[in-house]
Each structure stands twice: as structure tokens, then as C-alpha cells.
Amino acid sequence: STMFLTPNHKYILYNKLHLVPFAEYIPLSGQFPSLNNLNFGQGNFSHGTEYTVFKWKNTKFSNLICYESSIPKIVRKFIQNGANLITIQTNDGWLGKSAGPYQHYDIAKIRAIENRVPVIRSANTGISGLILANGISINEQPVGKTAVFTVSVPIGEAGSFYSQYGDVF
């Protein structure tokens, strides 16, 4: 889950919509309860149902949690609900020393381009940075580097043909 704490000390909660199979839940365990006896070291979480859009001054943003950035329809729905910025918090530690953290970052670039929306990505062990709506990376921090940085985010009119019509081809 993600919590957005407002200046007047109220909070808004977003619960992850798309859980990672075999890591955060066991698929079909509702239909076949004996699957719950499998132990892969997984969690047994419940997914959220709300496409939450947070508001801060003139910016409306939605947050993706880790694996959700690989699901195009989730970002599309956030944009349709009014988000003009996407943030991603992710744990890329499970990818180890592989191409995974780079691929995961590139997936975030694709989400920015296909929805014409800036993306801010914060990774605990992967690549962090700002991705502009055209896919160009700004202040990209490499895998394994600890960093804190401030960056100006150009907020424009989010949305594209894909945001409006989806997978029509």
C-alpha cells in the first residue's frame, strides 16, 4: 500500500491492484484451497480495488507499486481518472544482478510514452529517476546507488490515443 499524507495531516491510501503471482498470492487458491498449503515463501495479500488519484496543489498523480508498472491497463485507467503524473515505488532487489532492473526501468519508459505522462520512479536497489512524457530520462540514478535528489517535473496535459482507446489494434 501507499499512503499520501496531506499538509493538514489527513491521509489517503492506495492499495496495490495487481499482485505478483506466487510471491504475493497463490493463483486459483480460492478455487483449490489445498494450494494454500504450498510454501514458496509467498505472502497472502489481498489486492485493492480503487484507482486512486492523489491531489497536490495543481498536480494529480497516481502511484504504481513495483510490478504494476508492467500492466499497461492500470496506468491507462489512472490517466482516464485524471492523473497527470505517475509515480512508481519499487523493490528491484528480487531481480538480483541481472538485466531485470534495467528492463523494469525501461518498462516505466514505455508507460510514460504510451500515455504521454511523466513518471517518477523510486527504486530501493534498482534505477530511480524522472522519465519525461517522451521517454527521455532525467537524473537517472544507477542500480545500487543511494541518492536523494530534487528535480522539476514538467506537468502537462496527460493522455494519448492509447490512454483514450486502449488496445484497439
Where are these regions (language model features)?
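Enzyme catalytic cores with a strong preference for nitrogen-chemistry domains
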Residues: 1-169
